[in-house]
A protein has these predicted regions:
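Active-site-proximal helices and loops of the catalytic beta/alpha 8
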Residues: 1-49, 71, 98-128, 133, ...
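Short, surface-exposed beta-strand/loop micro-motifs that present aromatic residues
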Residues: 37-41, 78-82, 90, 148-160
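Aromatic/acidic polysaccharide-binding cleft in carbohydrate-active enzymes
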Residues: 50-116
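Short, solvent-exposed loop/turn segments at secondary-structure junctions
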Residues: 57-59, 96-100, 160, 170-173, ...
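Acidic/polar loop patches that form or flank catalytic/metal-binding clefts of enzymes
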Residues: 88-93, 133-139
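Carbohydrate-binding surface patches
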Residues: 144-181
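Beta-strand-rich binding/interaction modules
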Residues: 174-194
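C-terminal beta-strand-rich structural cap/linker in extracellular carbohydrate-active enzymes
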Residues: 199-216
Length: 216
């Protein structure tokens, strides 16, 4: 309704709820695809969606993200919110610390910032969004199979001469991945370790709740 009424962005609640179920092991990673297809018919073309792992409702009433995406579970889903098509990411109050409690919904509830444990993580993602046109809302999105799609979710974003590859392990177990798409083989920049690397067709492992992002 909001998108059809002229709003530029909407909350993709169905996607958030699917993310929660995947984090709990209740649904496979490819459950995200069903929501993507649903949203293509739910919203007008190119509707921007505000992806999130926590917001004021979910934090206060349902203990997001410290309860719904606890500890290392948070990271791959946060990467997803920052790199999906038609997305504008939401970082809720205190997530960069992180503040591991429910913030009062109606009353003043000051937060204390000391460690900023996720500062570099979020800064890396936000800088990537700022500099790379492949993460524009209208950049292309393509699923890529690099492993067991019940637990591995991988995709590319591309616009003009820029391309990004995202690989997410949405499970509590180490997984084996292998890149077979010839368009993804070769020199790439690892966004998180800031090193140039050569991606090849060899099998390798990705840690539980692991995430990899590459620029081409």
């Amino acid at each position: 309704y909001l998108a059809k009424s002229g709003f530029d962005a909407v909350y993709p609640w169905h996607m958030f709820k699917m993310m929660e179920k995947i984090a709990k092991g209740e649904r496979p990673a490819f459950g995200l695809d069903s929501i993507n297809k649903e949203n293509e018919t739910r919203y007008p073309k190119n509707t921007i969606q505000m992806y999130f792992t926590s917001n004021h409702d979910e934090n206060s009433w349902n203990h997001a993200d410290f309860g719904t995406f606890p500890n290392e579970v948070h990271a791959p889903f946060a990467v997803f919110t920052q790199t999906m098509k038609n997305s504008v990411p939401l970082i809720y109050s205190g997530q960069e610390e992180p503040v591991l409690r429910a913030i009062k919904f109606f009353d003043k509830d000051p937060m204390e910032f000391k460690n900023l444990q996720r500062e570099n993580f979020y800064k890396t993602l936000l800088n990537l969004r700022k500099r790379n046109i492949a993460l524009s809302a209208n950049a292309s999105f393509k699923k890529v199979q690099v492993g067991d799609e019940k637990v591995i979710y991988a995709y590319t974003r591309e616009k003009e001469n820029k391309k990004i590859l995202v690989i997410l392990n949405l499970s509590e177990n180490e997984q084996v991945i292998k890149i077979t798409d010839k368009n993804l083989i070769g020199k790439a920049h690892n966004v998180f370790n800031e090193k140039e690397t050569i991606l090849d067709t060899k099998e390798r492992k990705i840690k539980p709740w692991g995430y990899e992002v590459y620029e081409y």
